[in-house]
A protein has these predicted regions:
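A conserved mid-domain beta-alpha-beta active-site/ligand-binding segment of alpha/beta enzyme cores
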Residues: 220-251
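Catalytic alpha-helical scaffold of carbohydrate-active enzymes acting on polysaccharides/glycoconjugates
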Residues: 2-173, 178-217, 242-265, 271-312
Length: 312
């Protein structure tokens, strides 16, 4: 049943729950921090259907050189296309090598276009026993409020089915392109068998959402700490990102002595997979891995553990 609106809430998608009022959360082996690394594998469309709302960062400005809206759609966005293609041709392999080095199984967010057209990347993930989650249709085609409920249902279903076909396993996690949802999205995801969603960056622990049917949990990604928003749009240098990610972990680790926290690191191969940036990811992962009490997990493993705990 949907949550009742109450103190602190202006929607009924999940209950109001201050972290200080919750039971203590313990991760496996009494770890302080659960670390998950989500890597977006995305395709930037050469062309998109007419009147398609295109991806624009919440911080302002398009991801490529052009917005795709008149008059800029008179020619393809080669800049945006090239950036994302670089990630799938080159950058992803640097990220996977760094994750291998520290024994981290990735959670790979696939959009439909990647699932359909990049079987080599699927195989690389399968070699590492990665978890694959659904990530919309493409980087430029996002969920938006102009969709009817049935249009959004078909969008979600097409994404899920593409990942299932490409990987041989139906995904149970969802990461919306550009973190975009409508008020229908959680209900539609749960109805399609999705168990967790990564769009709600409002907590440091998982929590149960309240769809009309099915069961859905939040594994929140803090958008302003992902490599795109903090580095490119946030105009932080890569050295600053390195420091901020370490300080993020240090804060979670300190608070995790009292109750478990999670660090969901959200990465884009075309950004952090560049040769002058990858060293900083390696250093951050090395710093996190040097601490006792860190549980390295996939998104699904974190949700499975959380679900098995006493009623929260």
């Amino acid at each position: 049943m949907p949550a009742k609106r109450a103190y602190g809430m202006d929607q009924d998608l999940y209950p109001w729950s201050p972290i200080v009022t919750r039971p203590v959360l313990r991760w496996p082996d009494n770890a302080r921090v659960a670390l998950a690394v989500i890597v977006n594998l995305e395709h930037w469309d050469w062309e998109v259907p007419a009147n398609t709302p295109l991806a624009v960062s919440p911080l302002g400005g398009p991801e490529g050189l052009w917005t795709g809206n008149p008059p800029d759609n008179r020619f393809p966005d080669i800049g945006g296309y090239g950036n994302h293609e670089y990630g799938n041709r080159v950058g992803i392999f640097r990220i996977l090598a760094a994750l291998d080095k520290y024994g981290i199984r990735p959670t790979l967010a696939l959009d439909k276009a990647v699932a359909d057209h990049y079987p080599f990347l699927i195989k690389e993930g399968q070699k590492r026993d990665a978890e694959f989650i659904a990530h919309g249709l493409s980087r430029r085609r996002i969920i938006h409020i102009g969709m009817s409920e049935d249009e959004e249902r078909q969008y979600i279903r097409a994404s899920i089915e593409a990942v299932a076909k490409a990987t041989g396993k139906r995904p149970t996690g969802w990461s919306g392109p550009d973190f975009q949802e409508t008020l229908n999205t959680p209900n539609l995801l749960a109805a399609e068998g999705i168990r967790y969603v990564c769009d709600w960056g409002n907590d440091e622990q998982p929590y149960k959402m309240t769809p009309k049917t099915g069961e859905l949990y939040s594994l929140g990604v803090h958008a302003y700490l992902d490599d795109n928003y903090i580095h490119l749009h946030g105009r932080r240098t890569i050295n600053e990102v390195n420091l901020l990610w370490r300080e993020w972990f240090e804060g979670l680790y300190a608070d995790g002595a009292n109750t478990g926290r999670m660090m969901v690191l959200h990465l884009h191969p075309w950004i952090i997979g560049q040769p002058w940036r990858i060293r900083h990811l390696d250093e951050v992962l090395g710093h996190v891995s040097s601490h006792a009490g860190v549980w390295k997990a996939t998104g699904g493993e974190i949700i499975d553990w959380f679900k098995a705990q006493p009623v929260r």
